Structure formats: C-alpha cells, structure tokens
Amino acid sequence: MFVNHSTVARWENASRLPDAAMICRLAKCLSVDVNELFQLAARSKENPNVIVVDDSKVILSDCLSVLKEVIPNAMITGFIWPLEAIEYAKNNRVSLSVLDIELGTASGLDLCNTLLEINPCTNIVFLTAYADYSLEAWKTNASGFMLKPLTAENVKEQLKKLRYPFSIEGAYK
C-alpha cells in the first residue's frame, strides 16, 4: 500500500477521505483493530471545539457571535479569565483558540504556550487591536493573527490557513 504525506494531508483536511476498504488495509498495515480506526474516523466528524479568550465582555460577545455565524457546527465557548480557558483545555480537545494578546495582567502569548503544551495540535489565532504584536505572535507557532474588530471575512480567511484543519461542515456556504 502506498500512502505519502499528501495523501495524509488530504485526509486531514477532509478533501479526500479513506473509504472502508482503505481503512481495513490501514488497520492491517498498522497492526491495529479495524474497529479502532472506524471509531477514530467517526470521532473526526465531531463538531470542532473553539474557545475565545478576551478580557473585554463586549468584544468577547461580538467574537462569539461572529464565530457562531461562520462555524455553525462548532461548540464555541468564551472566557474572560485565562485560567478558566486552561482548565477547559485540559478537559476538552480544543481545535481552535482565538486569543487576545493583552488579557489584563495576563499575556495571550503565555496563554498560547500553555495551550500548546496541553495540546500541540490546537490552532491558535491571535486577535488584538495592536498590530505591533504580530512579530511576537508569530514566534509562538500560532496559526494566524487578526486585528480587532473580528469579522466573518477575517475568520473565513484564517480557517483556510490553519495548521491543523478541522471539519467545518455547513460553515459559510
């Protein structure tokens, strides 16, 4: 069986998915139970889990509305306090984290590093009113950077650029 990086990448971004026969062959090659792979495939269709962290309740509310419009199948949760977001990420697989950089006395850059320690496959997109932070933000392995206010168009563009794409069925069609 021939599977290369581009094959796996197409599976990951859901532009091409393995059929049942391919999953059976993969299970044999990997010496795993085929049912385990089918269960993993079913879970990959789960709704993405998105968190937003911003210390402004007004901005947080606006962000949640925009994200719900663009990714209607996502479970979207907002946090004002970074520690609450960390606890949530420890107990839930987060697909996308939208983080303000200035979080009162806390730093969104530090929060990014903590979230990536919890799950290295979390997509981090920074959202800030200050373009000056862009260079620092890129040093964190973030997937993207957006300036406030958040717009549906900006979110759509960022979703195309995620390091770890996830299923966005029904999103912005």
Task: Annotate each language-model stretch with its function.
Residues 104:
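The feature encodes the CheY-like receiver
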Residues 78-96:
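Acidic, metal-coordinating helix/loop segments flanking the phosphotransfer/catalytic sites
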Residues 150-159:
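C-terminal output helix
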Residues 57-77, 117:
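Two-component/phosphorelay signaling modules centered on CheY-like receiver
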Residues 109-121:
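Short amphipathic alpha-helix used as the core "switch/output" element in two-component signaling
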Residues 21-36:
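DNA major-groove recognition helix of helix-turn-helix/homeodomain DNA-binding modules
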Residues 100-101:
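Active-site residues of response regulator receiver
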